Amino acid sequence: MGIKLAHAMGAHVVAFTTTESKRNAARALGADDVVVSRNDDEMAAHVKSFDFILNTVAAPHNLDAFTTLLKRDGTMTLVGAPATPHPSPEVFNLIFRRRSIAGSMIGGIPETQEMLDFCAEHGIVADIELIRGDEINEAWERMVKGDVKYRFVIDSATLAG
């Protein structure tokens, strides 16, 4: 949703992915550019180029790889909450370039309503995979394996009443 929202707001959107196979999907969502974060050359091409990075990864990872991409006074905001902590970032990289790491949760009711209104106005919808109630265990296993493209939504009509 972040890619779709930023694109609709007119931002130049650069998406990061760990695999080449997701490049086309990110472009289809509205990304102007896609960087494979495991490709050192692609990452190096963006050093000191971003004012803001929205980091949605919910697994521990090296934050330094992304904070080095921030311009002076840039901010990376974390919205993914990993089960175990991220490795500690390199402090001098933050201090000397006045870079910041921030966190954010979902907004309150007014912010959520504003976002929903914006989505309705711009025809933005969530990409989901609809599953039946009897597929919940399979969906869980797929999630554990990382074999998930979009959020699962359970079709409530398939649940035993």
Mark where each language-model region is.
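Hydrophobic residues within alpha-helices
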Residues: 2-5
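Glycine-centered, small-residue-biased loops immediately flanking beta-strands
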Residues: 74-75, 99
